[in-house]
From Swiss-Prot:
Cellular localization per UniProt: Plastid, Chloroplast thylakoid membrane
Protein origin, superkingdom: Eukaryota
NCBIfam families in the cross-refs: PRK03735.1
Cofactor: heme b; heme c
Chain sites annotated for binding heme b 1: 100, 202
Gene for this chain: petB
Species name: Trieres chinensis
Protein name from the UniProt record: Cytochrome b6
Cofactor binding note from Swiss-Prot or TrEMBL: Binds 2 heme b groups non-covalently with two histidine residues as axial ligands.
InterPro entries (UniProt xref): Cyt_b/b6_N, Cyt_B6_PetB, Cytb/b6-like_sf, Cytochrome_b_N_euk/bac, Di-haem_cyt_TM
Transmembrane spans: 32-52, 90-110, 116-136, 186-206
Topological relation to the membrane, as annotated: Multi-pass membrane protein
UniProt keyword terms in alphabetical order: Chloroplast, Electron transport, Heme, Iron, Membrane, Metal-binding, Photosynthesis, Plastid, Thylakoid, Transmembrane, Transmembrane helix, Transport
Additional comment: Heme 1 (or BH or b566) is high-potential and absorbs at about 566 nm, and heme 2 (or BL or b562) is low-potential and absorbs at about 562 nm.
Length: 215
């Protein structure tokens, strides 16, 4: 085992990376309220794992979507548990995100030189809410359908660009298969990719600048 480690150490300098991570200074004022961001990230990982598991059975079709969700809940081994964890962690992710934003704001973590960290965090908050909006409609039940119809209709109030934006979101004049396909694509590919890139950027800036000091 030692030879295997030495082989990787010689090429990747694993120990130097581990020492750099473990030796990072943590200010003494940091307390449990500074854990909200880490909890959001943990919830995101749970979402990815449980969401990926459900893609094996979910069908993004207006005809089969509800039946496939019902199948996951009633027939797939532990399917009810996986979907329930997905829902619970989604709620937890949003709640922890809100608390994290409040904590950063109240402790002045958005001030110079951390403005860009704050900006990426705000964009991540928008992405998180978008996860909820797109995922809410995927079962394509009555609640999901009308929620989708209302959400995609909101931009119509924006002058000039509003109506074309509605067409892009819905994939046509009315809510239907094209809308569900767009929401599914956004929920399972576009938003996770955007969140991963933004989180990496967010973490690298925190790593570079450190945790803000006490007020």
């Amino acid at each position: 085992m030692g030879k295997v480690y030495d082989w990787f150490e010689e090429r990747l300098e694993i120990q130097a990376i581990a020492d750099d991570i473990s030796s990072k200074y943590v200010p003494p004022h940091v307390n449990i309220f500074y854990c909200f961001g880490g909890i959001v990230f943990t919830c995101f990982l749970v979402q990815v794992a449980t969401g990926f598991a459900m893609t094996f059975y979910y069908r993004p079709s207006v005809v089969d979507a509800f039946a496939s969700v019902e199948y996951i809940m009633t027939s797939v081994n532990f399917g009810w548990l996986i979907r329930s964890i997905h829902r619970w962690s989604a709620s937890m992710m949003v709640m922890m995100m809100v608390l994290h934003v409040f904590r950063v704001y109240l402790t002045g973590g958005f001030k110079k030189p951390r403005e860009l960290t704050w900006v990426t965090g705000v964009i991540l908050a928008v992405v998180t809410v978008s996860f909820g909006v797109t995922g809410y409609s995927l079962p394509w039940d009555q609640v999901g359908f009308w929620a989708c119809k209302i959400v995609t209709g909101v931009p119509a109030a924006v002058p000039v660009v509003g109506p074309p934006l509605v067409l892009v979101l819905r994939g046509g004049e009315s809510v239907g298969q094209s809308t569900l396909t767009r929401f599914y694509s956004a929920h399972t590919f576009v938003l996770p990719l955007a969140a991963a890139v933004l989180m990496l950027t967010h973490f690298l800036m925190i790593r570079k600048q450190g945790i803000s000091g006490p007020l």
